[in-house]
Amino acid sequence: MFEYLYGTVEYKKMDYIAIDINGVGYRVYFPLREYEKIEVGNKYKLYIYNHIKEDTYKLIGFLDERDRKIFELLLKINGIGSSLALAVLSNFSYNKIIEIISKNDYTTLRQVPKLGEKKAQIIILDLKGKLKNLTYTEEETVSMDMLEDLVLALEGLGYNKKEIDKTLEKIDLNKFSSLEDAIKGILKNMRIGD
């Protein structure tokens, strides 16, 4: 069993990456939400869930250990398999899931493909008690919301996704008090980088 893998991403497909560790390539499936964050040639530490079922063995990786914890909790719910649990984490971050559960927000949770009303209710009811010990970080939620708005604003100004992602990796969004301040700070940083 693997706790985590640390290595270089050799290539990536839509639902998995090949990570090289000392000349051995591991196929690791991951939430689609993290696709843009993972770049070929970079090193990453992936927290691994070892999915073993009858004749199948899959490594499922997460950039954040808290995402793996939520994934494991989802798998313990009757009727939720690895594909559906991965779909939930492909649509929502750790903090967003905590928020959805705490607010009983079935409507938002049902945005996950193939997740009907009944399963959404079961997930919320089942996780409500289990998530008491998991923390919700307000700062990170603000940053995620701001991040989405920033990307849209910068794309509107003509910057491409690769330029934007490269710049955002270097910046702590929590230091900005508003979206306007963040845009100014990022544009200044992008001009310096030119």
UniProtKB/Swiss-Prot annotation:
GO CC, any one term: cytoplasm
Function: The RuvA-RuvB-RuvC complex processes Holliday junction (HJ) DNA during genetic recombination and DNA repair, while the RuvA-RuvB complex plays an important role in the rescue of blocked DNA replication forks via replication fork reversal (RFR). RuvA specifically binds to HJ cruciform DNA, conferring on it an open structure. The RuvB hexamer acts as an ATP-dependent pump, pulling dsDNA into and through the RuvAB complex. HJ branch migration allows RuvC to scan DNA until it finds its consensus sequence, where it cleaves and resolves the cruciform DNA.
Region described as Flexible linker: 143-147
SUPFAM superfamilies given in the database record: DNA helicase RuvA subunit, C-terminal domain, Nucleic acid-binding proteins, RuvA domain 2-like
Family stated for the protein in its record: Belongs to the RuvA family.
Chain intervals for the UniProt region annotation (Domain III): 147-194
Region (Domain II): 64-142
Identification of the protein by name: Holliday junction branch migration complex subunit RuvA
Record field: transmembrane: none
Superkingdom assignment: Bacteria
Gene Ontology terms: biological process: DNA recombination; DNA repair; SOS response
Native organism: Fusobacterium nucleatum subsp. nucleatum (strain ATCC 25586 / DSM 15643 / BCRC 10681 / CIP 101130 / JCM 8532 / KCTC 2640 / LMG 13131 / VPI 4355)
Quaternary context: Homotetramer. Forms an RuvA(8)-RuvB(12)-Holliday junction (HJ) complex. HJ DNA is sandwiched between 2 RuvA tetramers; dsDNA enters through RuvA and exits via RuvB. An RuvB hexamer assembles on each DNA strand where it exits the tetramer. Each RuvB hexamer is contacted by two RuvA subunits (via domain III) on 2 adjacent RuvB subunits; this complex drives branch migration. In the full resolvosome a probable DNA-RuvA(4)-RuvB(12)-RuvC(2) complex forms which resolves the HJ.
GO MF entries: ATP binding; four-way junction DNA binding; four-way junction helicase activity
Lineage: Bacteria, Fusobacteriati, Fusobacteriota, Fusobacteriia, Fusobacteriales
Region (Domain I): 1-63
Domain notes: Has three domains with a flexible linker between the domains II and III and assumes an 'L' shape. Domain III is highly mobile and contacts RuvB.
Keyword terms of this UniProt record: Cytoplasm, DNA damage, DNA recombination, DNA repair, DNA-binding
Subcellular location: Cytoplasm
